Swiss-Prot record:
Protein name stated in the entry: Leucine--tRNA ligase
Motif mapping: 'KMSKS' region: 632-636
TM regions (residue ranges): none
Residues bound to ATP: K635
Annotated catalysed reactions: tRNA(Leu) + L-leucine + ATP = L-leucyl-tRNA(Leu) + AMP + diphosphate
Entry's EC annotation: 6.1.1.4
Disulfide cysteine pairs (residue numbers): none
PANTHER family for the chain: LEUCINE--TRNA LIGASE, CYTOPLASMIC (PTHR45794:SF1), LEUCYL-TRNA SYNTHETASE (PTHR45794)
Alphabetical UniProt keywords: Aminoacyl-tRNA synthetase, ATP-binding, Cytoplasm, Ligase, Nucleotide-binding, Protein biosynthesis
Source organism (scientific name): Methanosarcina barkeri (strain Fusaro / DSM 804)
Length: 966
């Protein structure tokens, strides 16, 4: 082995060996298979730390399964469809300054190459090469024969087949539907197309039509039931409103809304015509009619009304909305004569419409007063609003004032009221984003009611029922995400599946439309199996007919009929079908949590729609995001840490280990320079340890006579083997690295500190295999230096051997380590130079007391009095009658509080503490730097300060002779 760890040299060496040996190219055989996939990357930038985390998790799982004896397929492709790459090409062609800066400075594209990437095709080719290179350089065990891009002509044939079959099942429909829309591109946008607001959802509001003469002042609300409690409207005096003629289904009305709302209305299925501007003052102080109750309500000024939200006019329900109550109260003593308002607003009566167990008649007023909220600007007002809303939604029922709706649950009334209000022309539906959305082209997006649009009919209850069934049979990692998946399935509505611009596959039954980017990335895992035959030239595009896909993916028809249609031999068709049946279904789909509400859901929907139940996915795993020094990363805006730059600077194995050890699976990780530097030092130490063990030439097997410290390290390793395997099964990579590296490293240090050396080679043999999924290049290098001919990537992963567990040895070493730490702490605190240390082992009666306490704890009968009574009934313990009550009063609270772990281990093997400490005297004297004497607390020969009485089982009392340091 080299003197120093040189990651880049080692990594290039082993990547070359892996490629040459083709050990990651998977073919069907007699072994149990494991098919793992992760979302292929979108090629509008270089791979970043977020990809690094998700992809490395996948690789670690793949490598672990491979070492456990599974036949593992871990493939990769590239996603390029949609509009982002087209938009990026336009920005580069136009030399957009921000784009040129971000892609040269942060993505690392050379300045002479970047300007040439001015077409989508050039961008795809460039990032495809760079992404594959980055994944090879970090050491992913991918079968690269199966790679493809989503604009490959053969892939388009696969997508056409999928959509023809979905259409035949009635799962693709045409109609009007609200979609996220870019007015500039004149296209629907999906998450990949969005610059800001990627997590925004389309929210359905009910517009309530308050009337003033021949005008309608509509108000958007998420809670149409509160219309029964409206006392006034809020109008912003600083906003310009417009009068518009609005026509829907032949019904013509004149509406007053903000200019921003007018723009949004033009994208709905209404016909909207601008008439004139309306000064805000002209609609403040007017008396309007509540269309639901026919009550008269007044409009009042409110600067908090935002013109871009809803219609720019807000209805006020002060009995149930804390902000409305506060805003109304704030106006009680304000002179509003400039708006023609002279009446006393205190006379406005609150209207109660919801009965809530936790509140009286006016929940908003009650919570404002109980929380001491003084104004609308008080931060507690937001908290109060959430509390009232939550309690009313989950436990509220409507009162008599709501007429026929009395007694209905608030949680179930929205759709009923919206339907009834629409039918009576007192309300309409209006769609709004949950937060602002900006397209990657820079244009603010709108909710557009698109006519003649194609949709995937995800709201279909029969389709959803199959997805629920699939989910119920699946393993979800972590399990707590199951509820989120269930909720997302429940809420999922029809989704636009086509666009008119961008890269992608044309809808086979309507060539004017292109299938959108999330719609063509749902069952591509099955294409990996076909891609291997395309790559070797056995399949051509003309062979990929509908009957080809029907036969090899669905098993429909027979090979003879498919052969006649495709021009392929029956034998080849049967071979491809055999490959599909071997590899499918997907055993694990692992992804970032941002894909839960979209891609991962669609992945399930399309699988259950097209495949038989035995081909449905088996498991889903979800991981968190990665930030950079506390900042959220962005491919288009920065900051960003690319996979290539991390590996180039720190090496593949250090990058892999660090990204997986910073946070547990669903937690968000934060990449920090200080952290990666620490990981580098840890890996250096591991390399140095391995080099030292190998060069020592000492090899011992388990038949050698073993000392206690040897039995201890054997036992500890088994614990780490068990816990690492368990953590990897649960995809808890941080926990796995803690056990397989950091905790084991600490124990190896203790083993060597205690003079252990017999089993260092055995330790290294297991340690290298434990770490191989995480740091594969380094482990291959060490494995080879140990004399192994076959790669560690294919070696047997360590398996737990219960026969090597030695509780006695572990307990003994824990006592020695704890005793040493206690002595060192006393010396540190007292600032003493020790001359002699006296250790006092616990009297036997204390051990008996603790054993009795453990038994009574298990029987749920542990109480101070009960334990004293039981101990005093023992004739051998009666003579300790004065000391027993004090000790019992000390230990029982520890048992009760759950802090009795150190006592409970006493129920295990018997330890002769005095003999153990006497055997360890030479070690303790070397560590402490002075002589050590061991006494029994039952009869200490020397105890000038009566320390022996403090001795407890496994925790000797300590007295130090010495002098203060000058």
């Amino acid at each position: 082995m080299e003197q120093d760890y040189k990651p880049h040299e080692i990594e290039k060496k082993w990547q070359k060996k892996w490629d040459e040996s083709q050990i990651f190219q998977a073919e069907p055989d007699k072994r149990e298979k494991f098919f793992i996939t992760i979302p292929y990357p979108y090629l509008n930038g270089n791979l970043h730390a977020g990809h690094t985390r998700t992809f490395t998790i996948g690789d670690v799982v793949a490598r672990h399964k491979r070492m456990l004896g599974y036949n593992v397929l871990y493939p990769m492709g590239f996603h390029v469809t949609g509009t982002p790459i087209v938009g990026l090409a336009e920005l580069i062609a136009n030399r957009d300054p921000q784009t040129m800066d971000v892609y040269e400075r942060l993505h690392g594209i050379p300045g002479d190459i970047l300007p040439t990437l001015d077409t989508p095709e050039k961008i795809v080719d460039y990032f495809k090469r760079e992404s594959e290179k980055a994944m090879r350089n970090i050491g992913y065990s991918i079968d690269w024969r199966r790679k493809f891009t989503t604009t490959d002509p053969t892939y388009k044939k696969f997508i056409e087949w999928q959509y023809i079959r979905l259409g035949e099942k009635g799962l693709i429909v045409k109609g009007s539907h609200p979609v996220k829309w870019c007015p500039n591109d004149n296209n629907p946008v999906e998450d990949h197309d969005i610059l800001y607001g990627e997590e925004a959802t389309i929210v359905e509001y009910t517009l309530i039509k308050f009337r003033y003469k021949d005008l309608v002042l509509p108000c958007a609300t998420l809670r149409p039931e509160t219309t029964y409690g409206v006392t006034n409207l809020w109008v912003n005096p600083d906003v310009t409103y417009v009068k518009a003629k609005v026509t829907l289904d032949g019904n013509e009305e004149f509406w007053v809304v903000s200019k921003e709302a007018f723009r949004k209305l033009t994208f709905t299925d209404r016909t909207v015509e601008y008439i004139e501007d309306v000064p805000a003052k002209s609609i403040i102080g007017i008396k309007l009619t509540n269309p639901v109750t026919d009550d008269e309500v007044i409009s009042l000024p409110a600067s908090f009304v935002r013109p871009e939200n809803g219609s720019g006019i807000v209805m006020s329900v002060p009995a149930h909305a804390p902000f409305d109550y506060l805003a109304l109260r704030d106006l009680y003593d304000v002179d509003l004569s400039e708006y023609g308002i002279t009446e006393d607003l205190r006379k406005i009566k609150l209207i109660s419409l919801i009965k809530v167990p936790e509140f009286g008649e006016f929940p908003a007023k009650e919570i404002v007063e109980s929380m001491g909220i003084t104004s609308q600007k008080d931060p507690k007002a937001e908290e109060a609003t959430k509390i009232v809303y939550r309690r009313e939604f989950h436990g509220g029922v409507l009162k008599e004032i709501t007429g026929k709706y009395e007694g209905q649950a608030v949680s179930k009334i929205k759709d009923i009221l919206t339907r009834d209000f629409i039918s009576s022309n007192t309300g309409e539906t209006f769609y709004e984003f949950s937060e602002p959305v900006v397209c990657r082209c820079g244009t603010p997006c709108v909710v557009n009611m698109v006519k003649g649009q194609w949709f995937l009919n995800y709201s279909n209850p029969e389709w959803k029922a199959k997805v629920y069934k699939c989910l119920a049979q699946m393993r979800i990692v972590p399990e707590e995400y199951r509820v989120e998946f269930e909720n997302k399935i429940d809420w999922l509505k029809d989704k636009a599946c086509a666009r008119r611009k961008g890269l992608g596959t044309h809808l086979p039954f309507d060539k004017e439309w292109l299938i959108e980017s999330l719609g063509d990335s749902t069952i591509y895992m099955s294409y990996y199996i076909i891609a291997r035959f395309i790559e070797n030239g056995e399949l051509k595009i003309e062979n990929l007919t509908l009957s080809f896909f029907d036969y090899v993916l669905l098993g429909k028809g027979d090979s003879a009929a498919a052969s006649a249609d495709t021009g392929l031999s029956p034998e080849l068709l049967e071979e491809i079908r055999r490959h599909f049946n071997y590899w499918y279904p997907v055993d694990l789909r692992s992804s970032g949590k941002d894909l839960v509400p979209n891609h991962l859901l669609f992945f399930l929907f399309h699988h259950v729609a097209l495949f038989e139940e035995d081909k449905w996915p088996k498991a889903l795993a979800v991981n968190g995001f990665v930030s950079l020094e506390g900042q959220k990363m962005s491919k288009s805006k920065g900051p960003i840490l690319t996979m290539e730059s991390a590996v180039s600077k720190y090496g593949a194995d250090i990058t892999r280990m660090y990204i997986l050890s910073t946070a547990e699976q669903t937690q968000d990780a934060d990449w920090q320079r200080t952290g990666i530097e620490s990981a580098r030092r840890q890996v250096d130490r591991f390399y140095s340890f391995a080099k030292g063990v190998i060069e020592s030439g000492k090899r011992a097997d388990l038949s050698t006579e073993l000392k206690q410290i040897d039995r201890w390290i054997l036992s500890r390793i088994q614990n780490y083997i068990r816990d690492t395997n368990s953590a990897l099964y649960s995809i808890q990579t941080r926990e796995a690295i803690q056990n397989s590296f950091f905790l084991l490293q600490n124990d190896v240090k203790w083993y060597q500190r205690r003079g252990g050396e017999t089993l260092l080679y055995y330790v290294l043999d297991n340690w290298v295999r434990l770490m191989a999924p995480f740091t594969p290049h380094l482990c291959e290098e060490i494995w080879e230096a140990m004399g192994h001919k076959d790669p560690v990537s294919l070696a047997q992963y360590p398996l737990y051997n219960e026969g090597l567990i030695d509780d006695g040895a572990e307990l003994a070493e824990e006592m020695i380590k704890g005793t040493l730490e206690d002595v060192e702490e006393i010396i540190r605190v007292t600032k003493m130079t020790p001359q002699k240390v006296h250790l006092y082992t616990a009297p036997t009666w204390k051990a008996e007391a603790i054993r009795c306490a453990c038994e009574m704890q298990l029987e749920c009968s542990l109480e101070v009095g009960n334990l004293i009574k039981k101990l005093m009934a023992n004739p051998d313990l009666k003579r300790f009658g004065k000391e027993i009550p004090k000790f019992v009063q000390k230990i029982v609270p520890e048992f009760k509080s759950g802090s009795s772990d150190r006592y409970e281990i006493l129920t295990g093997p018997d330890i002769d503490e005095q003999a153990l400490l006497k055997e360890s005297i030479s070690f303790l004297e070397k560590e402490i730097g002075c002589s050590v004497e061991v006494h029994s607390a039952d009869s200490p020969a020397f105890d000038p300060e009566k320390k022996a009485r403090f001795a407890e089982p496994l925790r000797p009392a300590i007295y130090i002779e010495g002098k203060k340091k000058e």
